[in-house]
Swiss-Prot record:
Locations listed in the record: Cytoplasm
Protein name: Triosephosphate isomerase
Family: Belongs to the triosephosphate isomerase family.
Gene3D superfamilies, per the entry: Aldolase class I
Enzyme class: isomerase
Gene Ontology CC terms, in alphabetical order: cytosol
A biological process term (GO) from this entry: glyceraldehyde-3-phosphate biosynthetic process
Taxonomic classification: Bacteria, Pseudomonadati, Pseudomonadota, Gammaproteobacteria, Legionellales
Role played: Involved in the gluconeogenesis. Catalyzes stereospecifically the conversion of dihydroxyacetone phosphate (DHAP) to D-glyceraldehyde-3-phosphate (G3P).
Length: 249
């Protein structure tokens, strides 16, 4: 059975009082019968504080970024061993904002992906097309390029990882892919991975990240190849985030 996951990406939002209140509220509202693995990804400086606020084990902590070296003269960066020290379970790699604003290319994303795996954490590989790429019929070409970029290390590379489809045109815009549009791409990703390793493809968790909210989550999560969500803005509101989590069957 595939792991169901809902992850909240808080991006560069919140200060210490806000993040501690937010995670405490989420934990209080989440309940004990949650069908999904719930993760929160605060700004890196607050990871230890958020980890220390958790009381029940119903929520895990993740990181928004990592640098693909264990240590060295990389001013301002954080390595996987550092993140693991604070019990991070998941790490985002390849988020569209990192690709766009920090010019991270496929090779660099692949290095991050394998660095995270090598240190026993789970990378969430983010893939997705821009509006112009979609309008020019290049969606599958772009997705394949981004997914296959991490496959150079062999047929087991998609074991113990998550892939998040985040159409760039839907992030922070209020727009979202229809459930059917999202399902089509999720199925394409699973089939693509299946060409490398059929068993891993069947067990691969695929989540959707593109303006997920409490109004569209149930329809999205009902699709056969959508196993959860990567939630941005709505994850900054405890009630909204938990409503999304509860849409997981």
């Amino acid at each position: 059975m595939r792991q169901k996951i809902v992850a909240g990406n808080w991006k560069m939002n919140g200060q210490i009082q806000q993040v501690t209140e937010l995670v405490s509220q989420i934990e209080e509202l989440i309940g004990f019968d949650c069908a999904a693995q719930v993760a929160v990804m605060p700004p890196s400086i607050y990871i230890p504080k958020v980890r220390d606020c958790l009381r029940t084990g119903r929520i895990v902590v993740g990181a928004q970024n990592v640098y693909p070296k264990d240590y060295g003269a990389y001013t301002g960066e954080l390595s996987a061993p550092m993140l693991k020290d604070f019990d991070c379970r998941y790490v985002l790699v390849g988020h569209s904002e990192r690709r766009q604003f920090f010019h991270e290319d496929e090779n660099f994303v692949a290095q991050k992906f394998h660095h995270v795996k090598d240190h026993g954490m789970i990378p969430i590989l983010c893939v997705g097309e821009t509006l112009s790429e979609r309008e020019n019929g290049k969606t599958e070409q772009i997705i394949a390029q981004q997914v296959l970029a991490v496959s150079a290390k062999g047929k087991d590379c998609f074991r113990d990882c998550v892939v998040a489809y985040e159409p760039v045109w839907a992030i922070g815009t209020g727009k979202t892919a229809t459930p059917e549009q999202a399902q089509k791409i999720h199925q394409f990703i699973r089939d693509l991975v299946g060409e490398i390793n059929d068993s891993d493809a069947k067990h691969l968790t695929l989540i959707y990240g593109g303006s997920v909210n409490e109004n569209n989550a149930k329809a999205l999560f009902s699709m056969p190849d959508i196993d959860g969500g990567l939630v941005g803005g709505a994850s900054l509101n405890a009630k909204q985030f938990v409503e999304i989590v509860k849409c997981i069957n």
